[in-house]
Each structure stands twice: as structure tokens, then as C-alpha cells.
Amino acid sequence: MDNQKKYHHGDLKNLLIYQVLEAVKKNKLESFSIRDASRLLNVSAAAPYKHFQDKQSLIISSIVYCQNIFYSYLNEQIEKNTFSSHMQLINLGKCYLKYAFENPELFTFMFSLPLSGKERLHNYDKFHKLFVYTIKENLDEDSFRKRVSKSSAVNAAWSMVHGIACLIASKTISDEEVDGYINGKSFEEISAIWAVGVSKPPKYKL
């Protein structure tokens, strides 16, 4: 009984999020219910509502959780990589695409619903700063075209990478194309397209 009480009060919030993510992986989110999850976790039907107001709030918390995991993964890849600085943007982009390929359901889920203003800005800012840091390391400050701001350059890079990631997660493009982006030269090609559009031309730091 004591173990169940500890389980109920200590881990229930995260375990409910885990149940949502399992439903996402199995494409069963629509039929997911807090009541069924409570039964599976052997807690009272009322217990989850001490953590979440309703199913929607649980789903939103699960999205934020997913985005935090994704951000940590990308940040870890940046910190541990041994690439020269001009390869960091390519490395970040390829890791972004690889995550979408290996976790298609979760990737689609984490960007599927709009968050509240505060949550949206917080999560946007984290991903935005990753690209800002990488581009800053990749290009000199005076490399951008006069009519291109750093913010626009960052958003263009992020949009390009995220768009391809969505194509990968939704299985819209072939496995051969996916492999080209993650392991081949395709990503270098779109990086060159981005660089031509925002720079005059880029001056890579060696």
C-alpha cells in the first residue's frame, strides 16, 4: 500500500505523459483516455486530475515534454561534436532530420498543436537560439546581405530544415532521399542554397 501511495504521488505525472507518448507511437492518441490510463497505472480515476485539468492539458504537457527532449538531444549534439565551425550548421540540420526519421510519430506530435503564448515563445526561443548560435559560429557578422537580418537568416535556415523534417516524418519522400539528406550530400546542397540566399557570399571561419 505504501509503495502504491509513493507511486501515485511521486511518479504519476510523468507516467501519464509516458502513456500519452506510447499512444502517439501506436497512432492511438484519439482513443486515449485518462480513465483507461488510470486503470492501467492502478490509480484512482480522480488521481490524474491532481496534475492535469483534462485530456487536453495532459496532451499539451506531453508536447512540451517531447520538445524539451528534442531540444536536449540537439544541444547535446552541438556540444559534443568535433566538426570544424563551418560544419556545425550542417551537423545540426542532419541531427534534426535524423531525429524526425527515427521518431516520426513523436516529431509530428510535438509540432501538431498550438501551445499557449508563454509556452510557445519559450520553446520557440530555445530552438531559435540553437540556430542563432550555430549560424553565428558558421558565418562572420558582416556576411549577410544588407537586406537580410540575422533573424530572417535564422528563420530561413530553421524553416528549411524543419520543412524537410516534416516530409521525412510523414514519409512523403523516399527512403533513398531521406538517406541522401542524413548521410549523403543532399543536405550540403540545400545548405548552399540557403547560404547563397542570405550571404554575400559566406566567409567560413577555419
Where are these regions (language model features)?
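Short secondary-structure transition hinges
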Residues: E102-Y133, E176-G180
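Append "Primarily bacterial transcriptional regulators
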Residues: V20, F32-R39, P48
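Short amphipathic alpha-helical segment with a characteristic S/N-K-E followed by hydrophobic residues
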Residues: S31, D54-I59, S116
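C-terminal peripheral helix-coil segments that are non-catalytic and often amphipathic
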Residues: Y133-E141, G163-L206
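Basic, helix-initiating cap at the start of DNA-binding domains
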Residues: M1-N27, D36, S57
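Amphipathic alpha-helical packing segments from all-alpha helical-bundle domains
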Residues: N68, N75, M87, G117-E141, ...
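Alpha-helical DNA-contacting segments of helix-turn-helix folds
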Residues: V24, I60-C66, M110, N123, ...
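Hydrophobic alpha-helical connector segments
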Residues: E76-E105, K150-A157
